[in-house]
Amino acid sequence: MEAKIQFIKGLDEKVLPDVRLTRSKDGSTGTATFRFKNPNILDKTTAKEGEITGMYLIDEEGILETRDVNARFVNGKPEAIESIYIMKSPEAWDRFMRFMERYGETNGLVFSKAS
């Protein structure tokens, strides 16, 4: 199974996100902020598929989900989706990183540390 992201269950998001990670100094918690610029979920034809119910990160291990999903509007039109996924334990961080590794491999993404 390929790693994928969905906002409506059963409908894969094709636009690749910009993902920013932060982690507490002791490594116990972390936050991933996803930004999708002009995602296909905002397309008028896609809107007929249903409502955005959250962000679902799906891979062979299962589903990670967050309900923290917001649209960004420019001149009254939706232009981007921002979603925040919070990891509350080192195990949750490790699980998220395994998902991102698979998602990156599937979509040709690379990880780079901030300088």
Swiss-Prot record:
UniProt entry tagged with the keyword Transcription: no
Alphabetic keyword roster: Chloroplast, Membrane, Photosynthesis, Photosystem II, Plastid, Thylakoid
Pfam families in alphabetical order: Psb28
UniProt membrane topology term: Peripheral membrane protein
InterPro entries, A to Z: Psb28_c1_sf, PSII_Psb28_class-1
Predominant location: plastid
GO cellular component: chloroplast thylakoid membrane; photosystem II
GO biological process: photosynthesis
Gene3D superfamilies xref list: Photosystem II Psb28
Subcellular compartments: Plastid, Chloroplast thylakoid membrane
Xref: HAMAP family: PSII_Psb28
Subunit structure: Part of the photosystem II complex.
Family to which this protein belongs: Belongs to the Psb28 family.
Protein name: Photosystem II reaction center Psb28 protein
Species the sequence originates in: Phaeodactylum tricornutum (strain CCAP 1055/1)
Taxonomic lineage from the root: Eukaryota, Sar, Stramenopiles, Ochrophyta, Bacillariophyta
